[in-house]
């Protein structure tokens, strides 16, 4: 006990020394003098620990007060006279100590004497209520001294608060400009409802599989795209980095759409509040364009002439984009209104992401749901307009003659890539913050369904307004737009509001919806870029991440300024036409090839099925319908497997070849744009593909410098753990030929539970978590022990193997072991670990074996649980006496006594509240520990009464395999549970505190450490 006390004190001293090293970094002379003085104190303190522990503890308190005073001086100097954010905590310098220190020392053995407790005086805190922080404190822009203090607190990875936040964030990322602006433009361009056929085909056969691939990669690894592919295999890290790099130009040019929507929102709100007419209702003389401008209320005469456009189209090109003519391709000066709108857009993005997942989730709850409400309101208003049926008929009419053009299939594939966001890695990054056991396949299916429904809803809203304009202008739907339909949301809908009552209100709602739908995708792009760099440099400090996000927003604003120029629309148009094209098809094809063909689709689906706890089913005639559906359409089923292996590669290859062979120059308003803008678009969108060979070359160079073989480029050791580590790769073994050769390569097989989920209280929920589960209180402690064990041996295995062992071996297969420690007159039943190693003269160890013929008092999960009689000491003595008698008087002439079959242990289904199994092929059965001849005698004294308070018991479990249930008796594992007297009235559950290590040689599993509790108490301390 004294050794443990000293060890804990030495740990406190080392922590104090590290704290002094942090203080030493200050440049203040007074602080330097205090650190030198602290060094001398620490040297003296280390000497006192060996000689006098009590004196060392008291002197340690003085050192802590000295360090606290030094830290107060540091904080006072860094604040530069400013008022503190939190109220100061005043302590007595003579005998003050921090609460964690007092709890640590008081809980150590040997410090429970009254004289020691009196010397450690903890003064009461005068005021612990913090002041309300200022609004600028939310930005967490700390000084360097504050970063040193907060770095350890923030070194923890965030998770989504709920799975609803994760789903809404993914939905908000998908639902945006691709639905409200791009999808109606594609339908309008390809002649209506015929576009739905290739669109739905693309969603089903490579949209959903690729969404599931991205989400499962992120959730399985818990990392961004670059680190996820790095863990899969080093040669694939280039694909992950390409998915990150390609997001940078997309995030820059994507935000200019938000800037346009903000400008329209401001103009609409201005007209609504001031009561003025909307600026796009009538034509103006300063709008000098090549086409004739027509007022909305004079559409009949306007559309009878050629080269005429509506007032909303003229407003967008002349007022918003500041184009003089469609043939003027000069870049021109910056437009002040677009610069201000772009700055507002990046400010909104920063306020949405600066608090991490918490702020993103809160923002996404609004931006992902409010657009659906606004779209529903706009749809009801749109279908009530005269002529709306004309536009809806155009939307749902299928012209089969256009179905055989390859352009429509290419456009549908591009639209699917653009909508779902599978052309980059935001889905991987968002899934990395999800729980490990989350049903990611269900989320993938729901996201794709919601994506298709949103596209249909947006199309109905836009085309109801297009039909209304066509009816008012007495023209066909095909003739409403004279220019590129890509900007249909900014040219069609503003004109509709002029014919409505409260047109300013409806315009404000529409463009507010457009801002919300577009900006949440920007959150995902920025968070993915920041997460990739934070993971690459192994940083988790929130202050550093916030500064990185602020830098990305500032850099995005300056990089987006060329798009705010007079000719910036041409650069935007070139990038928009090349996005989700060659780059998306190439990266998707490389991702599928690495996962399905290099790593192996069967291996990957086995890993994901183990993560989701979905078995790989083999169907037969007796298979139920539910299992057949899982076999064909489950996460590891035929649909996903063949879609990723055959359909996706074929379609992506055909689309890539068709895009290369059918490439045409980019044009705007019927005129080809200058080659300079097109080259910029090529560099921005196709350039990230060069990252793949560049990173692969760097990986090869690193492998050669480390002296490894090239096959290590395809090493998957970081992806999943190996079940069989008994044979080391560097070991040599003798074959039949007698030559020493290298052992054959063994394919790593996945385990049902990963190594890290056996860690105690793993915060990421990757595996069974320790969670409360209330059990009925019985008359004994045995149900607790049986419930804590993972007893999964079947009756047939026990009956077949029990008869092959001797009576002595069979006595060690199915039992429950408990140990009691007697401290003078108090009896204690130890529920954890082996009996105490150091016992005094007055302490006795009693170990007993409960027989297999115990009565049963109740059932737990429909499994009978044996019950320990109330009088435990008497039964222990009687059973131990019988065992000694059998062992002491054996007779060689006696016939062998047949061993009766042992009762099966209870089968417990795996649940998150129970301790995890060691691996997928291991199960546990209890072991009987019978006291041998050298065991201490068990006396049936009066002290061993049934009224004694049993506080602990020990469960010893034996690890066996399915193939040989009782052969490896040498590999025993122990798992600990804790029950204190206060746990019984509260009905506390059992919690696993054993930490296992799966990466041990020869397949042995050992207990690395056991968390020990202090001595149980009967009532809370005063």
UniProtKB/Swiss-Prot annotation:
CDD domains referenced in this protein's UniProt entry, alphabetically: SLC6sbd
Chief subcellular location: membrane
Secretion signal, residue range per the UniProt entry: none
Gene Ontology, cellular component aspect: apical part of cell; endocytic vesicle; plasma membrane
GO molecular function, a single term: amino acid:sodium symporter activity
Membrane topology, Cytoplasmic segments: 1-165, 214-241, 359, 434-444, 520-550, 606-641, 699-1022
Pro residues: bias regions: 893-907
Bilayer topology: Multi-pass membrane protein
Secreted among keywords: no
Transmembrane parts of this sequence: 166-185, 193-213, 242-262, 338-358, 360-380, 413-433, 445-465, 499-519, 551-571, 585-605, 642-662, 678-698
Pfam family, one: SNF
Family: Belongs to the sodium:neurotransmitter symporter (SNF) (TC 2.A.22) family.
Quaternary structure annotation from Swiss-Prot or TrEMBL: May interact with STAT family transcription factor sta-2; the interaction is probably direct.
Entries under PANTHER family matching the protein: SODIUM-DEPENDENT TRANSPORTER SNF-12 (PTHR11616:SF324), SODIUM/CHLORIDE DEPENDENT TRANSPORTER (PTHR11616)
Name of the protein described by the UniProt record: Sodium-dependent transporter snf-12
Organism: Caenorhabditis elegans
